[in-house]
Every structure is written in structure tokens, then in C-alpha cells.
Amino acid sequence: SWYTYSPIRVRFPYVRSALLKVWKEAMQKTNDPVEAWEVISENPGMQKAYKQARGKGGFVRANWDEVNMMIAAQLIFTIKKYGPDRIVGFSPIPAMSMVSYAGGARFLNLIGA
């Protein structure tokens, strides 16, 4: 595919700087990713800080380990608090890419969504 080699392709994860800031603060306090996300999601001040930054750009480059940990913590927190059926996913139709579809569908199946 041409897109793989395109110079405009995004090759690294980017996170809204306000969210990354509150994430790092919460991680320093708790040293546990799931507890850190709980602190963020149940603290109105922290929620406001990153939610008000939406639509204003401000994305910064992050590393894969940090982003994957943040995503996993959010999923685990949601499953613990609300149950696995509250996770909604999207995979393209199988005709587009069976590998992409099967990977997403299998992940959702494994977490009980």
C-alpha cells in the first residue's frame, strides 16, 4: 500500500498534552496504572483539565509503552467498574481486511465485550 511509505503517515503515538500531564501526575501518586486512571476519572479537576483541551490541538509525541499502559488501564478500569459489556469496539468489515477484523473481534471476545 502507498500509505505505509507516505511521508505524511503518523508513525508515533500522539496524546493530548493535558491528558498526558494528568496521567503522569496520577501515576506519580499511585504507581499503579489502573488506580491512576481511577484517580483521573473520579477527580473532577483532572477531568476538566484534559476534557477542556479537546478540539484545541496540543498533541505531543508519546512513547508506545506509556500509551499502551494508558489504554490498558482505561479498559481494565471500565471493565472493573461497569462490566465488560460496556466496552465497544470497531473493526472494519472482513472484506476490507480479515486480519484487522479478526484481531479486533478476537480482542473484544477475549475481554468479554
Q: For the regions a protein language model found, what residue spans apply to each?
A:
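N-terminal export/assembly segments and adjacent metallocofactor-ligating motifs
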Residues: 1-113
